[in-house]
C-alpha cells in the first residue's frame, strides 16, 4: 500500500476512535423543546426553563422550590424510570404532535419511545399549567437546593 494512503487511513482510524468517546447528543432534547413550546405562554421561550429552580436543567438536588420546579423534578424521576427499563431517554426519538396546546404521543404503548414521550408530554403540560417566577431562574443552588 502507498505510504500516503496508509497515513490517511491511519488518521481516519484515529479520528474515529476519538469520536467514539464523545457522548451522544441529546436528540430527544429537540423534541422536548417542541413540546414545551406547544404548552407555554407565547411571551416565554423554552430556554427560560433551563437553570430554573433546583431541578430544571442539568442535575438536581434538595426540594423543588415551586410548582414549576416540581414539574422538572417529576420529569427527572420519569427519565430515571426510563433508564431502569434500559431505555435511554436522552437519545430516543419518538413520534408526537402538538395541536392547539394539546400534545399527542403516537408510538406503541409500552415501547421505550412512548415511555419517554409520555415523560416529556407530562412535563410540558405541567410547565404550561405552572406559574413562572422570574426570581427562581439561576438561583444559588448551594443555598436553596440542599
From Swiss-Prot:
Residues 1-19 form the signal peptide. Pfam families: Phospholip_A2_1. This is Basic phospholipase A2 beta-bungarotoxin A2 chain. It is found in: Secreted. It is an enzyme of class 3 (hydrolase). Its main location: secreted. Its EC number is 3.1.1.4. GO terms for cellular component: extracellular region. Keywords: Calcium, Disulfide bond, Hydrolase, Lipid degradation, Lipid metabolism, Metal-binding, Neurotoxin, Presynaptic neurotoxin, Secreted, Signal, Toxin. GO terms for molecular function: calcium ion binding; calcium-dependent phospholipase A2 activity; phospholipid binding; toxin activity. Belongs to the phospholipase A2 family. Group I subfamily. D49 sub-subfamily. Coiled coil: none annotated. It comes from Bungarus flaviceps flaviceps (Red-headed krait).
Amino acid at each position: 500500500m502507498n505510504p500516503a494512503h496508509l497515513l490517511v487511513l491511519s488518521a481516519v482510524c484515529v479520528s474515529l476512535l476519538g469520536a467514539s468517546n464523545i457522548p451522544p447528543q441529546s436528540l430527544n432534547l429537540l423534541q422536548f423543546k417542541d413540546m414545551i413550546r406547544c404548552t407555554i405562554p407565547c411571551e416565554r421561550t423554552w430556554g427560560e426553563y433551563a437553570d430554573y429552580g433546583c431541578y430544571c436543567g442539568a442535575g438536581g438536588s434538595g426540594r423543588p422550590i415551586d410548582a414549576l420546579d416540581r414539574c422538572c423534578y417529576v420529569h427527572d424521576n420519569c427519565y430515571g424510570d426510563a433508564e431502569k427499563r434500559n431505555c435511554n431517554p436522552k437519545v430516543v426519538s419518538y413520534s408526537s404532535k402538538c395541536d392547539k396546546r394539546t400534545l399527542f404521543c403516537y408510538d406503541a404503548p409500552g415501547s421505550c419511545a412512548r415511555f419517554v414521550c409520555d415523560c416529556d408530554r407530562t412535563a410540558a403540560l405541567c410547565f404550561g399549567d405552572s406559574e413562572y417566577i422570574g426570581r427562581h431562574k439561576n438561583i444559588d443552588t448551594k443555598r436553596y437546593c440542599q
